[in-house]
């Protein structure tokens, strides 16, 4: 083969990868400030050992790490991204190799992008390095590659601290001589087969019930519908693969939203995942005549669904069974081996897996409701006495204590565990049970004080509100009366906010933290809560958190269904954010102001000297550093914040983001669709939302993209810089200052990109109540006459103006 061209913006996109090599990691250093502690661990973990002789770099051969070399393929990506989640701490090594070909000797300027520590070698010579890993934002290192005529081996030796969501990402961007460089891989014998397989997969076109390709499938091509299982027991069952060799098209089964196509040639393996958007539809639990079940009937159906799952999957390695066990106990269901699952769960708590506080919280609920005897009773006692209930207690682990949901989980677990064993000694806490109970109680009160005053930081999160709900009802059920009442009121507030943002068939809301389910408002986790309240709505599994509710006396407040169904135009504050919401029969438009009106944000105490790190205020500040700020301002680095939606129902919704990743592979926060790499300026007023996205040179991804699932709308019209959308009586129009280009990644006919680091968008909403027809709406939208001045970074339209003033937020560097 003659070699591949460089990718978008000069990125090298063809690599071989070895690893990750994962080793248990322990460090004897101690620090009660976990923020400072993990920063220290990142500063010392990289060893930067010289690479030396690499040996032959061949697909299937072992590298210097004693891990196999693999050809790396990730459709559309500009990076090697092998990010994953580590429940216990690990030392991570991974190596990356590519070949740059030139016809003459040239010195090439390049930019290395990574969150890891990386040494870059060109033909065995060290050319530059990133000295230590960071959590965020991504690091950039400019360097010079001294290329010789012919093939040049570029070798990246990468090291990272594996703790929770770990960004094992690296990219190499060529800044000059781009037309003089071709890319290959070290394994020349595999290069042709890789090129054939990749060209085949990249030629895919997804249409309803078919996958089309430009050429017959190569030998070794197969496909599967398997993607993700809620039940860990089912996740362990091998996927069924169907042969596709020689086929130009694959006929797809209805009801199968995911298809993975794999090409294998010897030890070479390439995969591409496709998501059939139209096959992902709302799920309803209704009677045969289409009517809704009563609240009590529906509640039992919810508990039954949770009980039927053996253990909630936490990835490929293990599951968390406690919610499922609680649901089975509700039915006195002994059909599964729950004793074995309990012992496995206790082992995970004892080893202090990240999120083991979820298990502990459920275990406490179990003990309050069901008798335990004999060896199990003693084992539970031993595990609970020796647990690490806060980050300043003895122990070394990678647990996240500080997010809004985790903090409350740990606080209430400490309060309840201490109360259960009042006279016992908790060695990691160095407290008696009575002392631990008071310690946890004080922290719970501080958490309630904060949320009552400021509102939620993880506001409207359709993932984490389910977790917080489970923690709150433990406080409601197992606390003294006054605390219980306050916790119930906060729970009422949380459910009221979610109900307010429930629009027709889904939750349409900006969010403090979000994941990829943001694409499907009808299928987000918190729809499990909304379906509990209103059985007419679609249901979701919601990670099984409602298993906690099977033994709770918390009463769902009245009036929530009315909040879901009434028209509203309002704004309110939560955390440091101001949220805008307008919903009616025709459309829903919602956003956060960026920036909001002048106000004083709450003070981040991690930036102060001699601060009391034992308070919840410090924990909350800590969380802002890790999990992103609700102080929305243009130019601030993003995390998991979702900033706006326009929707015609829970399926037909649109939004724009600056992606934090160039593909959907890897566990990234921000990701391809969830969160923003850099926050935009946003302003909402009646039926109108404007956004300005300016991407700094310090960020590697130079485009923004629109999520617009065309199959969800009855009518879609592309006209110059406009897209016009209709569903039933609702209308949307989106204008971009750049000409948008369609892109097909995991989803087809869902994405439009604006390849510019400086772009503006205007979203106009309407419907039959305000417009005589769709044609009349189109005319009205165009008459807003949007215009964007790149120099002054000002977006203007009829009765609308927004300017972009860049802000920096020191809390978002870690």
Predicted regions and their residues:
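Accessory carbohydrate-binding/adhesion or oligomerization-edge regions at the termini
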Residues: 1-75, 155-196
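Extracellular beta-rich ligand/substrate-recognition surface
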Residues: 83-93, 131-136
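Extracellular and analogous surface-interaction loops
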Residues: 90-92, 96-108, 144-149, 203-204, ...
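Aromatic-lined ligand-binding clefts that engage carbohydrates, nucleic acids, or primary amines
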Residues: 102, 106-120, 154
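Beta-strand-rich ligand-recognition modules
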Residues: 119-171
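Ser/Thr/Asn(+Pro)-rich, low-complexity disordered segments
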Residues: 191-405, 435-444, 536-814
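Active-site cradle of extracellular carbohydrate-active enzymes
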Residues: 401-450, 454
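Extended amphipathic alpha-helical segments with heptad-repeat/coiled-coil character used for oligomerization
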Residues: 473, 481, 485-552
